[in-house]
Amino acid sequence: MLIPPINLHAWIEEHRHLLKPPVGNKCIQQDGFIIMIVGGPNARTDYHYDEGPEWFFQLEGEMVLKVQDDGVARDIPIRAGEIFLLPPRVPHSPQRAAGSIGIVIERVRLPHEQDGLQWYCPQCNHKLYEAMFPLKNIETDFPPVFDHFYRSLALRTCSQCGHLHPAPERYAAVED
């Protein structure tokens, strides 16, 4: 049975209150493609690794897509009305401004593929930690990996320069 068309503007207005921290992300379809509406602000310090491409369409406001490009950290600004196709296997960290709303489309993962979350030292860009896992549900699979990294001083301390990667406030009292 075919799913009827979704009035995207009406959907956003009806669900705008859900497109805010701490999650800010709502999946509207998962049949062949994962289609998400994402709102800002956010303050992610992780980089997502996806075996497939990701398509970004910025509807309202602006975002910066931080990427690791051949070992170099780069910023790619994406403004309202702009689209960007991120190639497969490029670590990326979406930074969304307050009040911004965008669409992200990813393909459903193939059975053998794994997603990853990576963290890099903000001082010297050395990779601090990487976790690879089969992604089933982006809203429930990411938080345990975030918890593992942010609760560990050892994982957050750069072996190259000694800098301690910052953790969100909610982790301040639970560090090892």
From Swiss-Prot:
Q: Which residues form the signal peptide?
A: none
Amino-acid positions noted as binding Fe cation 1 in the UniProt annotation, renumbered to this chain: H48, E54, H92
This protein's pathway reads: Cofactor biosynthesis; NAD(+) biosynthesis; quinolinate from L-kynurenine: step 3/3
NCBIfam families (alphabetical): anthran_nbaC (TIGR03037), PRK13264.1 (NF009763)
Q: Where does substrate bind?
A: E54, R96, E106
Q: What is its EC number?
A: 1.13.11.6
Instruction: Tell me what gene encodes this.
Output: nbaC
Q: Which residues bind O2?
A: R44
Protein residues bound to Fe cation 2 = C121, C124, C158, C161
Which reactions is this enzyme annotated as catalysing?
3-hydroxyanthranilate + O2 = (2Z,4Z)-2-amino-3-carboxymuconate 6-semialdehyde
Keyword match Oxidoreductase: yes
GO molecular function term, any single one: ferrous iron binding
The organism's superkingdom is given as: Bacteria
Required co-factor?
A: Fe(2+)
What name does UniProt use for this protein? 3-hydroxyanthranilate 3,4-dioxygenase
The role this protein plays is: Catalyzes the oxidative ring opening of 3-hydroxyanthranilate to 2-amino-3-carboxymuconate semialdehyde, which spontaneously cyclizes to quinolinate.
How many cofactor units bind, and how?
Answer: Binds 2 Fe(2+) ions per subunit.
Subunit structure, interactors included: Homodimer.
| Record keywords | Dioxygenase, Iron, Metal-binding, Oxidoreductase, Pyridine nucleotide biosynthesis
Please report which protein family the annotation says this sequence is part of: Belongs to the 3-HAO family.
Q: Name one GO biological process term.
A: quinolinate biosynthetic process
Q: Name one Pfam family in it.
A: 3-HAO
